[in-house]
From Swiss-Prot:
Any one Gene Ontology BP term: fructose 1,6-bisphosphate metabolic process
Gene of this entry: ALDOC
Residue list for modification Phosphotyrosine: Y5
Positions annotated to bind substrate: R56, K147
The protein's name in its UniProt record: Fructose-bisphosphate aldolase C
Modified residues (Phosphoserine): S36, S39, S45, S132
Family, as annotated: Belongs to the class I fructose-bisphosphate aldolase family.
Protein keywords: Acetylation, Glycolysis, Lyase, Phosphoprotein, Schiff base
Catalytic activity, reaction form: beta-D-fructose 1,6-bisphosphate = D-glyceraldehyde 3-phosphate + dihydroxyacetone phosphate
N6-acetyllysine modification, residue list: K111
Pfam families associated with the record: Glycolytic
Enzyme class, first EC level, given as a word: lyase
Length: 364
């Protein structure tokens, strides 16, 4: 086997590892506020608000104006390109607001999913062209981590070996390019919850996908201590008739991770995948109470599951902004507890927190 030339210096490795550990410090997770313009259209239309740049700015301001209470439960915020260069009402750049709280800034760098020819409707993710230059610029502008999402779906014939291999390689290329530019890559191979498959089938597919991802990361000489993983929890398909407990979901999820994710990885930041706010918190809590040894931090990287109640409270009205921000802080604190296995539940069976946030065939 030929010698592998060191891709990163000791200093570069230390910087990447330190950033990753800051993001997933105990009780901390990630706010995913990186919805594209198209995704924001869906969010805003739900509350009857027009999808303009100004309305998107006002909504992001609701989230980013949260006070210092979020410092103990939010370790990182993922921005969308547009948001990275927007300012609050006082002319302070959003990125400065987040950095001043001691929270790490991240950026979504993929350019969306595209069809993978020769498959049954499967996809790969585009955005590698010019990625190195974009990462260098984002690093200068204050971002220290990035996110790239690949999507796989479960059916009788999918995910195919081709889709698994292609997406694993794309994630590895992205991760390698990020690290060369001092940016911690969050690797996101999302297996969609669409379908009627049971828990066992999701666990099997999750194991196969994660095994392929870590093989690719190894092939591309990616420094695992300077990465984070953003996977789906192992859950049944949305149309599955069987209902599973949070404990069953936790056991299946932790088992799949233990079989595939090296202990060198500092943290696993779960996506919420259309679960309701409460469901996402209960499941994360159960995962952190799972009786199996867990060498990584197991925390959250939630979008809708941190924002749904805030969005509902805001409804595009300036007068509601403060109340909406409070709703966001409440969810952030709950998930900070769940990330430590300390969440006892709010007793809220109704309201926005219990609403399913599922969107079929979810594309950002």
């Amino acid at each position: 086997m030929p010698h592998s030339y060191p891709a990163l210096s000791a200093e570069q490795k230390k910087e990447l590892s330190d950033i990753a550990l800051r993001i997933v410090a105990p009780g901390k997770g990630i706010l995913a506020a990186d919805e594209s313009v198209g995704s924001m259209a869906k969010r805003l239309s739900q509350i009857g608000v027009e999808n303009t740049e100004e309305n998107r700015r006002l909504y992001r301001q609701v989230l980013f104006s949260a006070d210092d209470r979020v410092k103990k439960c939010i370790g990182g915020v993922i921005f969308f390109h547009e948001t990275l260069y927007q300012k609050d009402d006082n002319g302070v750049p959003f990125i400065r607001t987040i950095l001043d709280k001691g929270i790490v800034v991240g950026i979504k760098v993929d350019k969306g999913v595209v069809p993978l020819a020769g498959t049954d409707g499967e996809t790969t993710t585009q955005g590698l062209d010019g990625l190195s230059e974009r990462c260098a610029q984002y690093k200068k502008d204050g971002a220290d981590f990035a996110k790239w999402r690949c999507v796989l779906k479960i059916s009788e014939r999918t995910p195919s070996a081709l889709a698994i291999l292609e997406n694993a390689n794309v994630l590895a290329r992205y991760a390698s390019i990020c690290q060369q530019n001092g940016i911690v890559p969050i690797v996101e191979p999302e297996i969609l919850p669409d379908g009627d498959h049971d828990l066992k089938r999701c666990q099997y597919v999750t194991e196969k996908v994660l095994a392929a991802v870590y093989k690719a990361l190894s092939d591309h000489h990616v420094y695992l201590e300077g990465t984070l993983l953003k996977p789906n929890m192992v859950t049944p398909g949305h149309a599955c008739p069987i209902k599973y407990t949070p404990e069953e979901i936790a056991m299946a999820t932790v088992t799949a991770l233990r079989r595939t994710v090296p202990p060198a990885v500092p943290g696993v930041t779960f996506l919420s995948g259309g679960q309701s706010e409460e469901e996402a918190s209960f499941n994360l809590n159960a995962i952190n109470r799972c009786p199996l040894p867990r060498p990584w931090a197991l925390t959250f990287s939630y979008g809708r599951a941190l924002q749904a109640s805030a969005l509902n409270a805001w409804r595009g009205q300036r007068d509601n902004a403060e109340a909406a921000t409070e709703e966001f802080i409440k969810r952030a604190e709950v998930n900070g507890l769940a990330a430590q296995g300390k969440y006892e539940g709010s007793g809220e069976d109704g309201g926005a927190a219990a609403q399913s946030l599922y969107i079929a065939n979810h594309a950002y």
